[in-house]
Each structure stands twice: as C-alpha cells, then as structure tokens.
Amino acid sequence: MTKTSRPLYISYAGPSLLEMPLLNKGSAFTPQERVEFNLIGLLPQNVETIEEQVTRVYSQYKQCASDLDKHIYLRSIQDNNETLFFRLLDSHLDEMLPIIYTPTVGQACQEFSKIYRTHRGLFISYPERDRIDDILRSATKDRIKIIVVTDSERILGLGDQGIGGMGIPIGKLSLYTACGGISPAYTLPIVLDVGTNNRELLDDPMYMGWRHERVSGKEYEDFIALFIDAVQRRWPDVLLQFEDFAQSNAMPLLEKYRDELCCFNDDIQGTASVAVGTLLAACKAKNETLGQQKVVFVGAGSAGCGIAEHIIAAMRIEGLSESEARKRIFMVDRFGLLTEGMDNLLDFQKRLAQKTADVSGWTAGTEAFPQLLDVVTNAGATVLIGVSGQRGLFTEQVIRELHKHCAKPLVMPLSNPTSKVEATPEEILRWTDGNALVATGSPFAPVEINGRTVHIAQCNNSYIFPGIGLGVVACKASRITDRMLMAASNALAECSPMVTGQGDAVLPPLKEIQQVSRKIALAVAKEAQAEGLALETSEEALLEAIERNFWLPGYRAYRRRSV
C-alpha cells in the first residue's frame, strides 16, 4: 500500500530499531535488512509479508475475552509497530473503531493507571509548568503537524478522569491516521495534568497522575497560556485540537485562541460539523430545507450550543435572518427550555435562550419553564438532538409526539458511551413505526422493523475531523474558520447514501471514510484559500497535495545511514 518505492535511510540498528514503533517491521524485515541493520538472530528466521502479519495479529485479537482486552492488545501493537497497527485497522475498521475509540476508550480512560504499559505522548503537569519548553523538546518527533490535547476534565460522558484522559488524544490521533491519512510520524497526544477532583482517583494508590485537586481560575489560565506559547515556539504551524475540556473552559479557550493559532475544538466544532452534515443530508433526502426545520436540543452545554450555532449559521446561508433562525432552535436543560431571564445562564447559552414573549402562549405543565415534552409539542419539532449524557430522556411519549408533527423526524441521540444514550435506535424506530431517521453518537447494530433492515448511521466525529485535519495540512491553512467547518458539513452531506441514491443510511459506511475524508479535505482547503488563509493554488494542485499527505500503512525499504 505504500505510494513510494524510494528507500528510507536510517541510522538506527539492532534492538534499538526494533523498539521504535514508527520504524519497526518485526518479522517483515528482509534478509538484506537483517544483515545491514544487525538484526540476525533477533527475529525468527522466516520473513513475512505485512498481510501475513495482519492475519496473525487479527487471530490473536479475536482471542481477547473482552472489549477492554481488545483495546489493550491493539494499543500494544501500536506501541510496537505502528505500520502493522494501522494496516490492521485498515482491514477491519468497522469492527475495531468502537474498540480503539468510543465506547471502549471510555473504560480504558477509567482504567488507565491500572492498564498502563508504556509511554506514548507527553504528560505536562502543573508542578512542571516552568519546564514546558524542555518537555516539548523531549518529543521524539520533530515534524509535528497535529496535536490533540486534553486536560481530562470532561472525558466523554464520564467526567474527570485525571491523566487517564490520555486515552482520548491517543484514540483521536489514531483516527486522524486511519480515517484521514495523517502519518503517525506527524501526530502528538498531550495531557495537561492540572490535578483531578475525582476523589476515587486521588484515593487510588495506583493513580499515576499529580495527586492534587484541580487548578482553576487564573492559575489554570496562566498554565494554558504557558502551554500555548511553548507549542507555538516549538511547532508554529501545528494544528492544535482541544479535546474534552469542561464546558466552563472549552468555549472560552476556543474563543481566546482561535484567531491566534490554527486550533480546533472537536467537542464543539467537530460535533457541530458532523451533526449539521447529518441534518443537511436528511433535509436533502426529504427535499426540504434546513430553514424549514424546528430543532429541539436536550442538553445545553458547549457541545449542544456549538451544534445549535452551526445550524443557525447554515440557516442564515439559506437566507433566513439571524432572528428567524434562532426562533427555530430550542435548547432544553435539566430545568427546562432555556428562556431569557433564566438564572445562571452562561454567555453562550444566553444567545440561544428563547424570548419569553415567543413562548408565553404555550400550553405547558406547572414547572417554571417548559419541559421537553412541552417544547416538542408547542414548537412543532421536526428534529430532536440529544447531548445530555442521560439515559432514557427520549421517552416513548416524547418520540410519539415528535412523530405527530413530522412524518420522518430526524432523531439524533448523540451521547456517549452507549450507557448514556437518550434512546436506542430500536426504541425510536418502534415508536415511530419505522419512519424516523436515526443517527447516534455510539455504534449500534442494524434494526429489523416492518420486514426491512435499517442501518443506523453513527454520527461520529471521525467523519469530520480527519478530513478537516487533512485539508489543513495539505493546504497549510493558518486558521480554522466557521466557513471552513460549514464546507466540511456540506461535503459530508453530499456523501450520504440517501442523497446519492445508494442506500437508506443517513451517513456513508465507515468503509468509505477515507474517500469521505478526501472530499472534506478538498472542500476545507478550497474554503481556506478563498478566505486568504492558505496560498491559492489550482484544484488539481490541492488534490495532489491531499494525496501526497495521505499516508498509507505499508513498509518501505530501509538503507543504513552512517551516523
């Protein structure tokens, strides 16, 4: 699968070469390479192809007793031979994506200190804040193009996981490579260890992180600033992805730094982009416009509000005014519908609160603010999106009421992991007589209903962020803008089988994700050029750059270079 036959000249040899995951070939080193690099006797005599290696490791993988065991096994391959790891993923992506990322990665984060095997990435702790430059210099990779960083305060729907959150940057970057073709040589996972408020971790004798309550306020902000400044000195052109920061920090950090460097928050912007892409695909399939939809959210955190703002931006592109668009978005939290005058609303929530006058005539219960069923009923909802992290919030009554207003409602229970999902696809389809369009955050098996098989689209950020990263790297964009994200959403929608006429799923199958990433990369890069954020070239040149940067897992020939 390699795209070049040129040999790679390296100076490493013997056991040290076998201990380098980016260069190790294991049993695939050729007889000539074994002599040239002092490997005779360090490997079994038989020389294998990468296909034979994949067969062996897949057989071993199938013997693992649990999903967590499978995750640990795959990570051990990654830490030994990255090329083999990604070739294995390429052969079994549908099967292994839920293992290397959601939902299994959540358990891996919870058990991080117990299952820890070897180092990967950088751990930057608050007590070592004066040595961040030294820590970044210790990274063994010099040409980093994408960093995923977390402070682990909001890991999936599991909350504060301390340094265990490292599993998320590792998993995300694995998807940048498997889905978006970014070479693992150009990626770096980082955890910012600012302590933890998770008492279970603090009391755990095996916990490997800084045993201290979380730093907050000005101390936290100053630490983040030190980190950002150090990253810009070390890798000034890097794409920095913020991952799983708490909502109180996620949006402020994005707003503060998005105009200073090429950065991206996948929880806010990636989730929003894939959700809007899914919504656009559903609208295209039903011959409707986005502006015709009434969208109800359950969960008004940074992710939900980020999706809502992205939908509003898309509605405005269709021609609605901002006020018209905002009237079609309804945010429900644990207290009810976000309404102006509500206490303790964050700034990004206030923008999405409904005006009291607009809902004063609603028929509702006795609570101070309209509840979910009230909102679905009075708003005439056509789309229901769950980002609450609360199992079972989409009740049968709510879904049936939604179906009254819309023959084919779009229902998107996006919470991860599966134990946190607002309703299962089987429940949603049963309660709508098989008429709902369903996209979920976690993977679900197809559903049999009314004599047909319904394939469930996984509204997974892996459809979006690898393509965005590939586009940014290919065109060397200096920033990531809302219009670039909208370009990604539109490109994803155009790939929907419902739009292309190749199936009934809202999103394309994962086996096509590399082609989807290429299309998204082109759309993102063209928009970056249009905004003056990348050097303008022809579309042909962009396509060539995308292919040039798309790494495929295969072994190159090695030649010895003297030190």
From Swiss-Prot:
| Cellular component annotations (GO), alphabetically ordered | cytosol
According to its UniProt entry, one GO biological process term is: malate metabolic process
Which reaction is this enzyme known to catalyze? (S)-malate + NAD(+) = pyruvate + CO2 + NADH; oxaloacetate + H(+) = pyruvate + CO2
Q: Which UniProt keywords apply?
A: Metal-binding, NAD, Oxidoreductase
Residues given in the record as a divalent metal cation binding sites: E243, D244, D267
Q: Annotated Gene Ontology MF terms?
A: malate dehydrogenase (decarboxylating) (NAD+) activity; metal ion binding; NAD binding; oxaloacetate decarboxylase activity
The annotated active site, in chain numbering, is: Y101 (proton donor), K172 (proton acceptor)
The family database entries (SMART domains) matched by this protein are listed as: malic (SM01274), Malic_M (SM00919)
Q: What class of enzyme is it?
A: oxidoreductase
UniProt-listed Gene3D superfamilies: Malic enzyme, N-terminal domain, NAD(P)-binding Rossmann-like Domain
* Co-factor binding details: Divalent metal cations. Prefers magnesium or manganese.
Cofactors demanded by this protein: Mg(2+); Mn(2+)
Q: How does it assemble?
A: Homotetramer.
Q: Which family does it belong to?
A: Belongs to the malic enzymes family.
Protein name per the record: NAD-dependent malic enzyme
Higher taxonomy: Bacteria, Pseudomonadati, Pseudomonadota, Gammaproteobacteria, Pseudomonadales
Q: Which gene encodes it?
A: maeA
